[in-house]
A protein has these predicted regions:
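N-terminal secretory signal peptides that target proteins for export/translocation
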Residues: 1-2
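Acidic (Asp/Glu) and glycine-rich low-complexity loops/linkers
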Residues: 5-8, 19-130, 136-148, 156-165, ...
């Protein structure tokens, strides 16, 4: 009897260890150009061929991970019935490795982290982080690029594009290092921050709240600033600056613009750096 109990205990232990061991699975999915990552963990994205999706983690967790293509979007998420309390520590993280030929959209929802392992060459692209996650990519886009953050997460994007739009809502951050041949449009609502360097033909900036747009190292020909609240803007402008402040916000500028238009209702001010 004791021997049977011992054998049963060993079998149970082996079964438990098997579920706790790290394993890899290759998922077969249809063609996609967009990726949505909605689980705790890390995702590494490479642009190339052939298309490949590999997930790594504990076996008991991997069986709850869904990798479905909706239209042109690969969605990586858990089953709706998943008990998030089981995701206790770093050992429970899922790691995803993706190789894909064309990329025009990347998004992170929740606390995940997305890392671009290669430069992404594309036409237009949309980048988005919602929650406390992060994204770090290098992109060469011949068209338009968007990089938005909602929540406390952050985006770090480098490269070049025709136009760039970034909206940060909440306490998140966008770090931007881009050569922009056309217009850059920065918007912050809340206490978030945009840090930018590089160049752009023109810049539009709007802040609602206590956020910041720190772009003293972003060279531009003209800049339009609108602040409502206590937000702060720094910019490097060559030709024309137009700033309207409602509240206690401030605008600091580098360069020697030939034309500076400013108006303030409140204690806000516009000054040279």
């Amino acid at each position: 009897m004791k021997k049977q109990v011992l054998i049963l205990s060993i079998l149970m232990l082996c079964s438990f260890l098997a579920t706790q061991a790290q394993t890899k699975e290759t998922r077969n999915v249809s063609t996609f150009t967009k990726i949505s990552f909605r689980v705790p963990g890390k995702i590494y994205v490479r642009q190339g061929s052939p298309q490949k999706v590999v997930i790594e983690g504990k076996k008991e967790i991997l069986k709850e991970i869904e990798t479905d293509v909706d239209g042109s979007r690969l969605v990586i998420e858990t089953d709706d019935k998943w008990d998030w309390n089981l995701w206790k520590d770093d050992d429970d993280e899922v790691i995803v490795y993706i190789t894909v030929k064309d990329i025009d959209g990347l998004s992170v929802g929740g606390s995940g982290d997305l890392i671009g392992e290669t430069k992404i060459i594309t036409d237009d692209i949309n980048l988005n982080v919602s929650g406390s996650g992060s994204m770090k990519v290098e992109v060469e886009a011949s068209g338009d690029m968007e990089g938005d953050v909602s929540g406390s997460g952050n985006i770090d994007v480098r490269g070049k594009c025709k136009s760039f739009n970034s909206d940060v809502s909440g306490s998140g951050k966008a770090i931007v290092s881009l050569s922009i041949s056309g217009n850059a449009d920065f918007g912050v609502s809340g206490s978030g921050k945009i840090e930018a360097d590089g160049s752009a033909s023109s810049v539009k900036t709007s802040i609602s709240g206590s956020g910041k747009v720190l772009a003293a190292n972003l060279e531009t020909n003209s800049c339009e600033v609108r602040i409502s609240g206590s937000g702060d803007v720094e910019i490097n402008v060559k030709n024309e600056l137009d700033a309207i402040i409602s509240g206690s916000g401030s605008v600091r500028y580098k360069g020697n613009p030939s034309k500076v238009n400013s108006a303030s209702s409140g204690s806000g001010n516009v000054r040279k750096l």
